[in-house]
């Protein structure tokens, strides 16, 4: 594959083939962005009819934590690029695939290994790069966990070292919370059951996602780092419910946020978009986490930017130029399933789309749960406050209903 120079025709011998590992709502948008550039896309997930399966050229259902199954699928499909979109993947298999020269792993196999494990990325950020973070400790057993909580102090945040979307995450405020927090973390971790991170609680003013793009500069042919406008977001139980762009912040805080984002993404290397999560208080900024792929809070960029985070990711991994400029203030608000049922329907769509500046993305997930993210309302506005009000109004208008 000639990075940045040549794209083929899908379903032909000249095809440029990309395999996405994870075909949820974020993967679906990446697939659409790739297909607009004539890329042949193979979508892989652990369950059938995932959102990305519905729009890909080919779809597969496998256990992506099984290294043999993953390697066999890559050998069968022979993609030029493998793009992880979730955490629950056999990353050692990706490293072997990359080392053997079978295909390129985005951004790199090492970056995937580090960022899919909170321990790896925290040690890189705090211990190797010296970035500001909350105090932290790791624990493998309940006794180690209780000792870590005592050392960090109350309140503290507990997370499995491998989980996503707030699963297994809780705040420990007293002795009474310790055992329930351990049980919840054990239930929420995807792999490496039994290992958690305990983090000191930072009193922050707000959280941001600093979307950071590593792409090839067409003028120099070298990798260049660029930034989207900062995204503010509201989290409930570790899962995002609202996001907006741009998040107002001081010039010093923005400078520090981008310096942290640049340093951690440069250490990870490769091409693509990274979602760098940061805490901000006044001019002070702390590193929290980084995802080497589009970020759920970045769904707002479907309305706010000329090139969304998904288009930026697609372009960057293909070696194409990117333009991460903000077009308009915008916001997103999550639409939950509201009930536990397969094949639900949605009412109120007309009312939602009647809100000025509003749009919807209904993800097409085959099964709903009460707190599963099934869609998102987007809205633009003259400013962030207006956009947030419109997005929330549009989301509230959508009513998930039983199709039985």
From Swiss-Prot:
Enzyme class per UniProt: ligase
Binding site for ATP: 118, 159, 164-169, 199-202, 207
EC number: 6.3.1.21
Cellular component terms per the entry's GO annotation: cytosol
GO BP: 'de novo' IMP biosynthetic process
Subunit structure: Homodimer.
Family per similarity comment: Belongs to the PurK/PurT family.
Alphabetized PANTHER family for the sequence: FORMATE-DEPENDENT PHOSPHORIBOSYLGLYCINAMIDE FORMYLTRANSFERASE
Protein's name according to its UniProt entry: Formate-dependent phosphoribosylglycinamide formyltransferase
Organism: Burkholderia pseudomallei (strain 668)
Organism taxonomic ancestry: Bacteria, Pseudomonadati, Pseudomonadota, Betaproteobacteria, Burkholderiales
Gene: purT
């Amino acid at each position: 594959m000639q990075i940045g120079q040549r794209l083929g025709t899908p379903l032909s011998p000249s095809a440029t083939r990309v395999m996405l590992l994870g075909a949820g709502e974020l993967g679906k948008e990446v697939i659409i962005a790739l297909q607009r550039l004539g890329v042949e896309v193979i979508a892989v997930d652990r369950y059938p009819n995932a959102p990305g399966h519905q729009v890909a050229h080919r779809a597969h259902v496998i256990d992506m934590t099984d290294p043999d199954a993953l390697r066999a699928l890559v050998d069968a499909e022979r993609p030029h690029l493998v793009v992880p979109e979730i955490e629950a993947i056999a990353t050692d298999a990706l490293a072997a695939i990359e080392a053997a020269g079978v295909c390129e792993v985005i951004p790199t196999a090492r970056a995937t290994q580090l960022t899919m494990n909170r321990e790896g990325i925290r040690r890189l950020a705090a211990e190797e790069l010296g970035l500001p973070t909350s105090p932290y400790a790791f624990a493998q057993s309940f006794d180690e966990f209780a000792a870590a909580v005592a050392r960090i102090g109350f309140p503290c945040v507990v997370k499995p070292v491998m989980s996503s979307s707030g699963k297994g995450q809780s705040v420990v405020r007293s002795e009474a919370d310790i055992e329930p927090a351990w049980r919840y973390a054990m239930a929420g971790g995807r792999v490496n059951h039994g290992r958690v991170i305990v983090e000191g609680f930072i009193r922050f003013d707000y959280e941001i996602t600093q979307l950071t793009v590593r792409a090839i500069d067409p003028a120099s042919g070298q990798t260049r780092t660029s930034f989207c406008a900062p995204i503010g977001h509201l989290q409930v139980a570790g899962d995002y419910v609202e996001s907006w762009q741009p998040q107002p912040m001081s010039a010093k805080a923005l400078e520090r946020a981008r310096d942290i984002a640049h340093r951690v993404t440069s250490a990870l290397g490769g091409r693509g978009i990274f979602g760098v999560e940061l805490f901000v208080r006044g001019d002070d900024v702390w590193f929290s986490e980084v995802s080497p792929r589009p970020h759920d809070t970045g769904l707002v960029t479907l309305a706010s930017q000329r090139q969304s985070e998904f288009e930026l990711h697609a372009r960057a991994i293909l070696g194409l130029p990117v333009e991460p400029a903000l077009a308009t203030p915008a916001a997103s608000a999550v639409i939950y399933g509201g009930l536990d049922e397969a094949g639900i329907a949605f009412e109120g769509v007309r009312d939602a789309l009647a809100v000025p500046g509003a749009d919807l993305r209904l993800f097409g997930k085959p099964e709903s749960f009460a707190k599963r993210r099934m869609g998102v309302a987007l809205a633009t506005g003259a400013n962030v406050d207006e956009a947030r009000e419109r997005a929330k109004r549009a989301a509230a208008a959508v009513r998930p209903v039983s199709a039985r």
